[in-house]
């Protein structure tokens, strides 16, 4: 009897627990991608594996360490470029008055000067670049001499390499050589036709057309703008002042051309 009563009580207890019980789903059956959407970041990090957390921390530290030197190098390069820009602007401001004056007087030379910074020779040796710029002014005359008289051009090139003056100061030497080439032609023109010679020197002078003798007397007292602009003409005019006292220049132009040129001494 007692066993039957105990079995009945056990069945009643099981029935009562079955009616009051609720079904609880297991968390392991839910997908892991849904959990971080409903939990805060700190809670989701707590569910990660410790190895994953250590890996993420290591990656963050490595990224911060690698980015810091790159940022420092970029700042140093920017600072260096800024210093170079400031120095270049200061140098340009020093040369602005001279360049502005050069642009008004000679635009072609000003444009050549603007290319100075892009010329490797100018950056390495400014003096050599200036001599090269001066030599380029005489290239057309030398090219014309090479076409008209190749032998004279070759002789001049040989003298250019052997003359101490040509080695020390090539532009001055070329000016003297060109003066020696121009003076005979102008002297011959002055002896053959003084009026045409004076017209060639000063085409806008009316006194030259009307009275050449009066002009020859007056040119020793007045300033010649062409002589100021062209040193070759200035040297030739100084030489022509000795023309009335030179018998060979009036009697024999060939002997006059063989005499030493006085105008070359001013260089």
Swiss-Prot record:
Residues 1-21 form the signal peptide. The alpha zeins of 19 kDa and 22 kDa account for 70% of the total zein fraction. They are encoded by a large multigene family. The gene is AZS22-14. It comes from Zea mays. This is 22 kDa alpha-zein 14. GO terms for molecular function: nutrient reservoir activity. Zeins are major seed storage proteins. Disulfide bonds: none annotated. PANTHER family: 22 KDA ALPHA-ZEIN 8, ZEIN-ALPHA A20-RELATED. Keywords: Seed storage protein, Signal, Storage protein. InterPro entries: Maize_Zein_Storage, Zein. Belongs to the zein family. It comes from the Eukaryota.
């Amino acid at each position: 009897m007692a066993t039957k009563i105990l079995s009945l009580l056990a069945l009643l207890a099981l029935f009562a627990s079955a009616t009051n019980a609720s079904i609880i789903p297991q968390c392991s059956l839910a997908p892991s991608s849904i959990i971080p959407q409903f939990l805060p970041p700190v809670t989701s990090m707590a569910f990660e594996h410790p190895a994953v957390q250590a890996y993420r921390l290591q990656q963050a530290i490595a990224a911060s360490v690698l980015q810091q030197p790159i940022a420092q190098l970029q700042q140093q390069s920017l600072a260096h470029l800024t210093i170079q820009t400031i120095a270049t602007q200061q140098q340009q401001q020093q040369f602005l008055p001279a360049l502005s004056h050069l642009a008004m007087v000679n635009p072609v030379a000003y444009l050549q000067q603007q290319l100075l910074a892009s010329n490797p020779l100018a950056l390495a040796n400014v003096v050599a670049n200036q001599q090269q710029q001066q030599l380029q002014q005489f290239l057309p005359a030398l090219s014309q001499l090479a076409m008209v008289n190749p032998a004279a051009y070759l002789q001049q090139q040989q003298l250019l390499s052997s003359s101490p003056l040509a080695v020390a100061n090539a532009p001055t030497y070329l000016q003297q050589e060109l003066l020696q080439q121009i003076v005979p032609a102008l002297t011959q023109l002055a002896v053959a036709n003084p009026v045409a010679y004076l017209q060639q020197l000063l085409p806008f002078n009316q006194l030259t057309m009307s009275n050449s003798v009066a002009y020859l007397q007056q040119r020793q007292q007045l300033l010649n703008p062409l002589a100021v602009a062209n040193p070759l003409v200035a040297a030739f005019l100084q030489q022509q002042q000795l023309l009335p006292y030179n018998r060979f220049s009036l009697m024999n132009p060939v002997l006059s051309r063989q005499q030493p040129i006085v105008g070359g001494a001013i260089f």
